[in-house]
Regions:
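Active-site mouth loops of central-metabolism enzymes
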Residues: 5-23, 66-78, 135-151, 227-241
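Active-site-adjacent beta->alpha loops and helix N-cap segments on the catalytic face
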Residues: 17-20, 45-58, 76-83, 101-126, ...
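Short, well-ordered coil/turn segments that N-cap beta-strands
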Residues: 2-5, 33-36, 62-66, 91-93, ...
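Active-site glycine-rich loop that binds ribose-phosphate moieties when present
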Residues: 145-164
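Conserved, mostly hydrophobic/aromatic
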Residues: 9, 37, 87, 159, ...
Length: 288
């Protein structure tokens, strides 16, 4: 089996304890030589400053290729592009451009009066600067707000045509879900690489709730597996095995890149990567 290229998603810490956990995650996973790491942007733009700080610190302290999430929510065009310019000034040239989730308790996305109306407008503006590699989100089981799968794929094509060069998918539980989506994208004329998003399941109850909220289908057999694993105190063993099997199936189907949603908890992601043959780089200086 071919060894995949990998990347990781982190989220910015809000507390000192969370900061320690983020850096533990970075120190654990960075030796695996990720192609890039991304840093999220909270719902409603709630972590805007935290994201900016985390992106700058990660880039400066680690030398990793850091991709900053950037959204359209609750900011004018001028403010949003100023943040992007701050990233560029700090040496960060990769952005994950998203519409963004509306603030909790709101009735859906409402553009800022002077802001970008949607993700395509944001992508186009970023592309015009010529400063960034732009990635976008994709939904193998369609975005919850999309009318249908065809409309969702058409929207993804618009994002690629606006200037994005790659797409990262929402997580899913079965490889065939991704393959059907990939085939549909190719049929729609989307030639940009589509990177599967992988969620190693740290907590089945939480993962199940999140899957339901974002429209990810939950196979019935997963409930049975985790019910038994939790009773037998083998949750992590099952989670590692399932994620490894999913990734292996994707690689066998031609996937070359995998993007892991780490939730700032590195152990399962590290174990899955090791099982896939992704191991820390060792130099002569390390062993001398």
């Amino acid at each position: 089996m071919k060894t995949p290229r990998i990347s990781f998603e982190f989220f910015p810490p809000k507390t000192l304890e969370a900061s320690f956990r983020l850096w533990d995650t970075v120190h654990t996973l960075s030796p695996l030589d990720p192609r890039f790491v991304s840093v999220t942007y909270g719902a409603g733009g709630t972590t805007r400053e935290l994201t900016r700080e985390a992106v700058g610190t990660l880039h400066k302290a680690t030398g990793l290729n850091v991709a900053a999430h950037l959204t359209c929510v609750d900011a004018s065009r001028e403010e949003t592009l100023a943040i992007a310019d701050q990233f560029a000034t700090a040496g960060v040239s990769e952005i994950v451009a998203l519409r963004g989730d509306p603030p909790k308790g709101s009735n859906g996305f409402t553009p800022h009066p002077q802001g970008f109306g949607d993700s395509c407008e944001l992508i186009s503006a970023l592309a015009e600067t010529g400063k960034f590699t732009i990635r976008v989100g994709a939904y193998p089981e369609k975005h919850p707000e999309a009318a249908d799968s065809r409309a969702d794929i058409d929207w993804l094509k618009r994002k690629i045509d606006a200037g994005a060069t790659e797409a990262i998918t929402q997580f899913f539980f079965e490889a065939d879900t991704f393959f059907r989506f990939r085939d549909a994208c190719v049929a729609a004329g989307i030639n940009a690489p589509i990177i599967p998003g992988i969620l190693p399941i740290e907590n089945w109850t939480g993962a199940r709730k999140f899957a339901t909220s974002c429209g990810t289908q939950i196979p019935a057999w997963l409930d049975d597996c985790f019910d038994k694993a939790i009773r037998d105190d083998r949750h992590d063993l099952l989670a590692t095995a399932l994620a490894t099997e999913l990734c292996s199936d994707l690689i066998e189907g031609g996937v070359e890149d995998l993007h892991f949603y780490t939730l700032n908890r590195p152990e399962l992601t590290r174990d899955v990567c090791h099982a896939l043959g992704v191991t820390p780089r060792v130099t002569l200086r390390d062993v001398a």
